[in-house]
């Protein structure tokens, strides 16, 4: 199986992407370009997919939004543009005995507006609580409108600054604004490092808040936002680099969102493999790709993976991307493994009944989306000193006469046998292959929409992490604190393995409802070399937003941060 690792050759086809392309100009003032899936080439691709899947799905015509960012130190009163957005905490909104702002910046703005800002914010009941926002059209400033956005507590987090950027983007959409600025009411207590991270989070929020996945809508509004100035957080190469970095990560997050949003009649295992190869060809100075077909997977004895894929008319594709810096010594080798079920019907244990959400099972490749999104971002960032392997065993879990049956005994690529007691516990069968083939690395992180049990335990916005390694747990949690993505470590209770024992094979593939997320992690542990640090991330909850009815791109930002922590950058 080590032969799969570190393959450096690949063949590429002129197969156009149906996903967003990004182009960046120089760091100081760069643009984020979203290429729609409606170009002539994309239409040809959509049509070729439709012939295979009878979807007949075409994408709409839309223009690509471009945002130019600049970091400036100017007087807010003098800034000229459509919307001046000010992020304010509850403390910033404190008033004196005359109901006037005590915050110096708000005082200055209010004075310039002859007291209208304090009066209008009172009428709108704006108190600076997290999630609050109001847009005011007040004469007297260089900006046409002023938007106030609540940050909550004075010790605002990465998430709060990201929400500030998203709120500014939402205000721009509402007002059809083309140029906006974002500032903080107070930067007291913010170190130089915190100012940089705040600028990065604001940029992330603005980019992702502007982006809308309208590929499958017959009509859509064109984004109007063209430029965004970040005021009062510094100028120069350091902040320019941070803003550029945030935009690069956003490119990966948006790819992750689009992959998850794409319906199964469009995003087949073959198309997912083509998207992976597109990443390798775009960043060919640091990436290589190796895509294995079914016959090659058979030669490598990937039985547990191929049995899951056996019922589908869309054949399995095993994806391996390898990132190697173009120069310098490799200090670490790590791997990212993503579950890649482009659709999961549940198989013969079909998903039925309330809450089964079979219509959303296109998101069962959310782990793969995070892994490939991270690959795209890292292709732009190009960290030094670290070799990264990206593994996705892409397939569908369907029902047919050739499909996997309850009671079947299958053999994994490491030789262990598995009695299938539930065909809807298929993700761990495919992940076992991805994990097994990466024993030549020092660290492995796998990501999967693996269990409903994890969603029950942690809710819809927190991913569960499982690892025997305290050091790896600290690394990944530290990365998540920078990215703002929420993780929570859950126990790997070895005594629960008793429920995974089979009378006729080495193990069964599910231990039942109690502790389901834990037993799933214990199953995956069977395929990890003891010398390799390994972590499993169950992102079944946060990969999808029920409120927005859209993918989140969860996992991309944390993976990129973690890879950078393992690099020599």
UniProtKB/Swiss-Prot annotation:
Which organism does this record belong to? Solanum lycopersicum (Tomato)
Q: Which residues form the signal peptide?
A: none
Q: What is this protein called?
A: Neutral leucine aminopeptidase, chloroplastic
Gene name for this UniProt entry: LapN
CDD domains found in the cross-reference section: Peptidase_M17
Can you list the GO cellular component terms from the UniProt entry? chloroplast; cytoplasm
Origin, by domain of life?
A: Eukaryota
- Using the UniProt record, give the first listed, main subcellular location: plastid
Q: What induces the gene encoding this protein?
A: By wounding.
